[in-house]
Amino acid sequence: MFRKAILIIHGFAGGTYDEEYLSNSLEFVKNFDVFSFTLPGHESRKDKATRADWIQSARNHVEMLINHGYKDIYVIGHSMGGVIASIVASEYKEIKKVVLAAAAFQYLNSGSNKTNVKELASLIKRNVIDYSAEEIFSRFLKMPLNSLKEFMSIVKENQDVIKSVDAPILILHGKNDKLVPLTSSRYIYNNVKSKSKIYYKIKGVNHDIFNSKRKEEICEIIIKFLKKNHKCIIEEEI
């Protein structure tokens, strides 16, 4: 099949609505078929989904695309979805390109991923106060403590997975992100196996990257990356 499948994976406490503008933009691109899904436990806050459920759900969607004949699959992951996208990219040869937006290999500004659940909840509350109660922080607070624990575990347990990702990769991170620090994308850039890697630090953009004031420009960057073959190493502030 000559058409390309694009699989978008949303972040923790989020949903497909976070990437709706991106999805709509990609659907207008010739030969792109766009797919997204809601991670288990995110349809209802009462669900007790685990990190294994999140990862398996992504695997199931990748395998569904393979079974439908797609030979070229591009994955886009936002926040925790970036960690999950990296996991499946390391496992399936059919995944030919990867886009990671504010991928949460680290979180908040605790200085460590060893923070416990109560400390993380406290950090979230403090950030809500300090940064004008951004919607995404508020969503975090509505998630069960067990889900927060699962989020912390998926990050901690998959620190090395990026070292097995060898597909061309585009890394995007807003410079005003208060949830996932820039050091997370720096870690990805320094450790990814890919020989072709592009890292853009984007001025004036927070964690909600696909709904920011620069969302149109960001989508254009992603489309350009997915349409063309890149063999380059770029790190730039834009």
Please identify what each model-predicted range represents:
Residues 204-238:
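Catalytic active-site module of serine/aspartate enzymes centered on a nucleophile-bearing elbow/loop
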Residues 176-180, 208:
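Acidic catalytic loop of the alpha/beta-hydrolase fold
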Residues 27-46:
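Conserved alpha/beta-hydrolase
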Residues 12-24:
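The serine-hydrolase catalytic nucleophile loop
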